[in-house]
Protein backbone atom coordinates (compact mmCIF):
# COMPACT_ATOMS: atom_id res chain seq x y z
CA UNK A 1 0.00 0.00 0.00
CA UNK A 2 1.37 3.41 -0.93
CA UNK A 3 2.36 5.77 1.84
CA UNK A 4 0.26 8.87 2.36
CA UNK A 5 1.77 12.32 1.89
CA UNK A 6 2.00 12.69 5.69
CA UNK A 7 3.74 9.31 6.10
CA UNK A 8 6.18 10.07 3.26
CA UNK A 9 7.16 13.43 4.69
CA UNK A 10 7.54 12.03 8.23
CA UNK A 11 9.66 9.18 6.83
CA UNK A 12 11.90 11.63 4.94
CA UNK A 13 12.39 13.84 8.00
CA UNK A 14 13.06 10.72 10.11
CA UNK A 15 15.71 9.55 7.60
CA UNK A 16 17.40 12.94 7.67
CA UNK A 17 17.54 12.89 11.47
CA UNK A 18 18.90 9.33 11.51
CA UNK A 19 21.67 10.37 9.13
CA UNK A 20 22.89 12.92 11.64
CA UNK A 21 23.09 16.61 11.01
CA UNK A 22 20.91 19.53 11.88
CA UNK A 23 17.38 20.54 11.00
CA UNK A 24 16.65 24.24 10.88
CA UNK A 25 13.00 25.24 11.16
CA UNK A 26 12.18 28.49 9.39
CA UNK A 27 9.15 30.76 9.62
CA UNK A 28 8.89 33.60 7.11
CA UNK A 29 12.50 32.88 6.05
CA UNK A 30 13.86 33.30 9.59
CA UNK A 31 15.41 30.40 11.48
CA UNK A 32 13.26 30.05 14.59
CA UNK A 33 14.57 26.74 15.90
CA UNK A 34 17.13 24.04 15.36
CA UNK A 35 17.28 20.35 16.23
CA UNK A 36 20.75 18.79 16.30
CA UNK A 37 22.07 15.36 17.18
CA UNK A 38 24.87 15.35 19.75
CA UNK A 39 26.35 11.86 20.10
CA UNK A 40 23.88 10.53 22.65
CA UNK A 41 20.72 12.49 21.92
CA UNK A 42 18.99 15.46 20.35
CA UNK A 43 19.11 19.11 21.41
CA UNK A 44 16.47 21.69 20.59
CA UNK A 45 17.40 25.38 20.23
CA UNK A 46 15.11 28.37 19.70
CA UNK A 47 16.12 31.74 18.24
CA UNK A 48 14.69 35.20 17.71
CA UNK A 49 14.61 36.79 14.24
CA UNK A 50 18.20 38.06 14.68
CA UNK A 51 19.25 34.44 15.25
CA UNK A 52 20.12 35.15 18.90
CA UNK A 53 19.76 32.04 21.04
CA UNK A 54 16.67 32.23 23.26
CA UNK A 55 16.71 28.74 24.78
CA UNK A 56 18.06 25.23 24.46
CA UNK A 57 17.00 21.91 25.87
CA UNK A 58 17.93 18.26 25.61
CA UNK A 59 15.19 16.12 24.12
CA UNK A 60 15.68 13.24 26.55
CA UNK A 61 14.40 9.92 25.29
CA UNK A 62 13.36 11.39 21.94
CA UNK A 63 13.67 9.23 18.86
CA UNK A 64 14.11 10.45 15.30
CA UNK A 65 10.55 9.31 14.58
CA UNK A 66 9.11 11.24 17.57
CA UNK A 67 10.92 14.35 16.39
CA UNK A 68 9.85 13.84 12.75
CA UNK A 69 6.21 13.69 13.89
CA UNK A 70 6.67 16.81 16.02
CA UNK A 71 8.15 18.66 13.03
CA UNK A 72 5.32 17.49 10.78
CA UNK A 73 2.77 18.84 13.26
CA UNK A 74 4.72 22.12 13.47
CA UNK A 75 4.57 22.49 9.68
CA UNK A 76 0.86 21.77 9.53
CA UNK A 77 0.05 24.62 11.95
CA UNK A 78 0.99 27.20 9.34
CA UNK A 79 2.09 25.48 6.13
CA UNK A 80 2.36 28.63 4.04
CA UNK A 81 5.09 30.09 6.24
CA UNK A 82 7.02 27.11 7.57
CA UNK A 83 10.00 25.45 5.97
CA UNK A 84 12.58 22.93 7.06
CA UNK A 85 16.18 23.19 5.95
CA UNK A 86 18.49 20.30 6.64
CA UNK A 87 21.99 21.26 7.80
CA UNK A 88 25.04 19.00 7.57
CA UNK A 89 25.01 17.03 5.28
CA UNK A 90 22.86 19.86 3.91
CA UNK A 91 21.07 17.97 1.19
CA UNK A 92 17.38 18.72 1.38
CA UNK A 93 14.86 21.45 1.91
CA UNK A 94 11.14 20.93 2.35
CA UNK A 95 8.47 23.29 1.09
CA UNK A 96 4.87 22.86 2.02
CA UNK A 97 1.45 23.67 0.53
CA UNK A 98 2.57 26.75 -1.38
CA UNK A 99 4.57 24.56 -3.78
CA UNK A 100 3.29 23.11 -6.99
CA UNK A 101 5.02 20.91 -9.52
CA UNK A 102 4.56 21.06 -13.30
CA UNK A 103 7.11 19.67 -15.73
CA UNK A 104 9.90 20.12 -13.19
CA UNK A 105 8.93 23.76 -12.61
CA UNK A 106 8.61 24.81 -8.99
CA UNK A 107 7.04 28.07 -7.90
CA UNK A 108 9.10 27.86 -4.72
CA UNK A 109 12.44 28.33 -6.51
CA UNK A 110 12.53 32.08 -5.88
CA UNK A 111 11.50 31.55 -2.26
CA UNK A 112 14.14 28.82 -1.93
CA UNK A 113 16.77 31.23 -3.22
CA UNK A 114 15.76 33.86 -0.65
CA UNK A 115 15.91 31.35 2.19
CA UNK A 116 19.20 29.85 1.04
CA UNK A 117 21.03 33.15 0.83
CA UNK A 118 20.10 33.82 4.46
CA UNK A 119 21.21 30.38 5.63
CA UNK A 120 24.52 30.12 3.82
CA UNK A 121 26.47 30.45 0.56
CA UNK A 122 26.56 27.91 -2.27
CA UNK A 123 23.40 26.22 -1.07
CA UNK A 124 22.43 25.28 -4.61
CA UNK A 125 25.06 22.52 -4.65
CA UNK A 126 23.65 19.05 -4.02
CA UNK A 127 20.26 20.20 -2.88
CA UNK A 128 16.79 18.94 -3.52
CA UNK A 129 13.27 20.19 -2.89
CA UNK A 130 10.36 18.22 -1.54
CA UNK A 131 7.48 18.65 -3.96
CA UNK A 132 4.06 18.52 -2.34
CA UNK A 133 2.25 17.46 -5.49
CA UNK A 134 4.36 14.52 -6.60
CA UNK A 135 5.49 13.77 -3.01
CA UNK A 136 9.08 13.29 -3.98
CA UNK A 137 12.37 15.16 -4.01
CA UNK A 138 13.30 17.13 -7.10
CA UNK A 139 17.09 17.57 -7.55
CA UNK A 140 17.97 21.22 -7.53
CA UNK A 141 21.16 20.59 -9.51
CA UNK A 142 19.03 20.27 -12.67
CA UNK A 143 18.33 23.99 -12.53
CA UNK A 144 20.78 25.75 -14.83
CA UNK A 145 21.37 29.01 -13.01
CA UNK A 146 20.03 31.22 -10.22
CA UNK A 147 19.87 33.95 -12.91
CA UNK A 148 16.62 32.39 -14.08
CA UNK A 149 15.05 33.97 -11.00
CA UNK A 150 15.72 37.52 -12.17
From Swiss-Prot:
Keyword Metal-binding: yes
Position of the signal peptide: none
Entry keywords, A to Z: Early protein, Metal-binding, Zinc
Keyword field contains S-adenosyl-L-methionine: no
Note on how the cofactor is bound: Binds 1 Zn(2+) ion.
Expression induction or repression: Expressed in the early phase of the viral replicative cycle.
A GO MF term: metal ion binding
Cofactor: Zn(2+)
Summary of subunit composition and partner proteins: Monomer. Homodimer. Interacts with protein B119L. Interacts with membrane protein E248R.
Summary of the function given for this chain in its UniProt record: May participate in a redox cascade for the formation of disulfide bonds in viral proteins.
Family: Belongs to the asfivirus A151R family.
Protein name listed in UniProt: Protein A151R
Protein source organism: African swine fever virus (isolate Tick/Malawi/Lil 20-1/1983)
Lineage: Viruses, Varidnaviria, Bamfordvirae, Nucleocytoviricota, Pokkesviricetes
Amino acid sequence: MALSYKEKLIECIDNELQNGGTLLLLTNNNVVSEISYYGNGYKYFTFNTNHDLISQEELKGATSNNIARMIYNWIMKNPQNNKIWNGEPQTRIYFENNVYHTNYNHECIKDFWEVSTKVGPCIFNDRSIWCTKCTTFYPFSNILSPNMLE
